[in-house]
Amino acid sequence: MISEYLFPKRGNFLRKNSTNKLLISINDNELNNIYLINGTSFITKNIRAKDLIIEPHNYYMIINNGKKKIKINYNHDISIHDIIYNPYKYEYSKKSDFDPETFKKLYNIPEGFIDVLSKWYSIKFTYPDYNLIYIKPEMGISIQVHYFRSEIWEILGGKPIVINGNKVFYFVENGTYFENPINTYHSVINPNIDPGNFVLIREKWEGKFDEKDIERVYNPNKYY
């Protein structure tokens, strides 16, 4: 039996299971305080013991959404599993927001944008009727919900991992669309290692556009 502790509002790595079935056990009293990725499912409530069985070659991740640390037990060594996404790889690194002018020149950003939101892990160029969002390799945006607007995403590059409602989509091809209705979970992870291989999304929205309508239910980048 292998164990680890997960502190409040922290997640472990998104991993890919090996050839054996992985059995995860968590105290029953804590199951209501976790979010779980198991293969193509993103489970946020009514988690049961059977949901913690990870089939061979499936992806998995646990997020502690509670207020106390939890103990996670595994029936075999997970250190041999491939790490697809480490949310905290740059936690203690010096962080600088992208410079919009430099980024524009490097990545041939189309003219006509009316606003820019630059962070250290992503940059968004706002046009009159859509946004272009670039996400840094090995990074993801927070798992979030909106209360006053819905969004439509079109994947334009980078083959991201996308959380859309209670489903997870892996290495998504260009031209794929996702609808994110009001009050539904959504997120994007860039699994690429090449520092120039950004994920690119074209985002459109309906409703009231206001960054303050976001609830970030899992926010490893600590951006508010």
Residue ranges and their predicted role:
Residues 10-45, 49, 137, 147-166:
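Glycine- and acidic-residue-biased ligand/ion/polar-headgroup-sensing regions
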Residues 82, 195, 200, 207-224:
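Anionic, Ser/Thr-rich low-complexity intrinsically disordered regions
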Residues 65, 75, 146, 165-167, ...:
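Surface loops and adjacent helix of pleckstrin homology
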Residues 1-19, 55-129, 142, 216-224:
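A short, N-terminal "cap"/entry segment at the start of jelly-roll beta-barrel domains
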Residues 33-60, 125, 164-187:
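Short acidic-glycine-tyrosine-enriched beta hairpin
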Residues 13-17, 123-124, 133, 141-147, ...:
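Short histidine-centered beta-strand/loop micro-motifs
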Residues 51, 130-134, 152, 177-179:
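Conserved hydrophobic/aromatic beta-strand scaffold that supports enzyme active sites
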Residues 7-11, 57, 136-140, 148, ...:
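Tight coil/turn sites that cap or link beta-strands
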